[in-house]
């Protein structure tokens, strides 16, 4: 029988990997496996894989979905645009449903409301799995983010209904340290009196990190997000705030830093630990 029709407990990791490589024409091991059966409005089974390496054509506008659609284990299409949202186009695998018609044309399938329900169900499941992974294995999630974060951020523009879920997954470089931070991490480190999430966006990560615009913020030890993905300038037009704090560019208008608490410095303070140069940190990532 088809591997996805079997119970997950009866499938070994090696069998999953073998199927992933065969179905995806890939050579890596999957970074994460999502095998899910949904019984409800539209019954369907999905066996999806997040690759451990980014495909060369990830940012190709013409890139087709690598998730195959089956109806009752009969292959229907591997180019169904409305099965997986564009911002999850890194997914590989299959979706099988007994509730779609075998006789419908591919064109008719695109407008089938049942397909839209399957798409929503899968999207929520995948975002939920990524959230769990980010909590349980933050270092592994960093690997995922390095490969696919720039694509996932497209969901902030494409999918307003799930924007908050996508935003929770987003990770950013900042002036705080050389790792990646979530927006919740940033909020937790905000200084007393800090009313905004400060960021600087540009095309070159190293140039951003060396910008003189950062000097006033460094002097007050106020964290600034450093955004260098092409998609960043676009999603910031759609996302205005997070947890009540607005996003504010440090290069547009003068930032009022007077109301933000000064660092209390004394000889025993941890704040006296020398802060590593931000440009060096960016270069090391």
Language model segments and positions:
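Conserved GHKL (Bergerat-fold) ATPase module
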Residues: 1-285
């Amino acid at each position: 029988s088809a591997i996805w029709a079997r119970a997950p407990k009866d499938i070994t990791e090696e069998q999953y990997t073998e199927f992933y490589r065969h179905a995806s024409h890939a050579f890596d091991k999957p970074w994460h496996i999502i095998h899910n059966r949904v019984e409800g409005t539209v019954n369907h089974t999905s066996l999806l894989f997040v690759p451990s390496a980014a495909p060369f054509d990830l940012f190709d506008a013409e890139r087709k979905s690598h998730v195959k659609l089956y109806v009752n284990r009969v292959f229907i299409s591997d180019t169904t645009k409305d099965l997986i949202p564009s911002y999850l186009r890194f997914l590989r695998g299959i979706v099988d449903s007994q509730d779609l018609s075998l006789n419908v044309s591919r064109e008719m399938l695109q407008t089938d409301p049942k397909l839209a329900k399957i798409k929503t169900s899968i999207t929520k499941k995948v975002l939920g799995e990524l959230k769990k992974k980010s909590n349980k294995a933050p270092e592994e999630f960093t690997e995922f983010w390095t490969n696919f974060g720039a694509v996932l951020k497209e969901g902030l523009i494409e999918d307003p209904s799930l924007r908050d879920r996508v935003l929770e997954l987003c990770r950013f470089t900042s002036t705080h340290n050389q790792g990646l931070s979530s927006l919740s991490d940033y909020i937790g480190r905000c200084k007393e009196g800090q009313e905004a999430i400060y960021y600087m966006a540009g095309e070159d990560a190293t140039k951003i990190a060396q910008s003189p615009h950062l000097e006033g913020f460094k002097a007050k030890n106020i964290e600034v997000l450093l955004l260098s993905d092409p998609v960043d300038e676009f999603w910031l037009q759609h996302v205005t705030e997070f947890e009540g704090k607005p996003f504010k560019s440090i290069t547009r208008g003068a930032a009022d830093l007077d109301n933000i608490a000064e660092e209390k410095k004394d000889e025993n303070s941890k704040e006296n630990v020398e802060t590593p140069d931000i440009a060096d940190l960016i270069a090391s990532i």
